[in-house]
Regions:
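Acidic, PIN/NYN-like endoribonuclease modules and their adjacent C-terminal/linker elements
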Residues: 85, 96, 108-133
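A secondary-structure boundary/capping signal
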Residues: 5-7, 37-38, 106-107, 123-124
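Short, well-structured N-terminal submotif of metal-dependent ribonuclease cores
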Residues: 1-37
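PIN-domain endoribonuclease scaffold, especially VapC-family toxins
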Residues: 27-82
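Active-site neighborhoods of divalent-metal-dependent phosphate/nucleic-acid chemistry enzymes
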Residues: 69-103, 108
């Protein structure tokens, strides 16, 4: 299974230890599925951790490097303008390039799509339920 996490999943996994987002991220590290991300997603994640959570640069850098080691990092060209929030379009582009089965997100605009070009867009709870038989 090929999966793309939205920025909000990474931020929750890193900033809220012991939560469901961290559980999903740890499943990726364990190899339960193939995790894909992009430079744009990592850049946005770094900005949120630094600006909203006051993480120091070195802590942010370490977190982004850890994600980069557990996920395949892609560089899709920004071509989509389907959603008003441009970072949401970067998530869709990453999923397209990864040929992802799922996008996992807490973003209502992405979740409202439900599916895009063969990729199912799931909430974190729905994704975790799918992982557990």
């Amino acid at each position: 299974m090929r999966v793309v996490f939205d920025t909000n999943i990474y931020v929750s996994a890193l900033a809220i230890p012991g939560g469901k987002a961290e559980e999903a991220y740890l499943e990726a590290i364990r190899g339960a599925f193939e995790l894909f991300t992009s430079v744009a997603i990592l850049t946005e994640t770094a900005a949120v951790l630094q600006n909203k959570f006051d993480w120091e640069q070195e802590r942010v850098r370490n977190a982004i490097q850890a994600i980069g080691q557990s996920a395949t990092v892609l560089r899709p060209r920004p071509t989509l303008h389907l959603l008003q929030d441009e970072p949401d379009n970067r998530i869709l582009e990453c999923a397209l390039e990864a040929h992802a089965n799922h996008i996992v997100s807490g973003d209502r605009h992405l979740l409202a799509l439900r599916q895009h070009e063969g990729t199912t867009i799931l909430s974190l709870a729905a994704f975790l339920a799918e992982l557990k038989p």
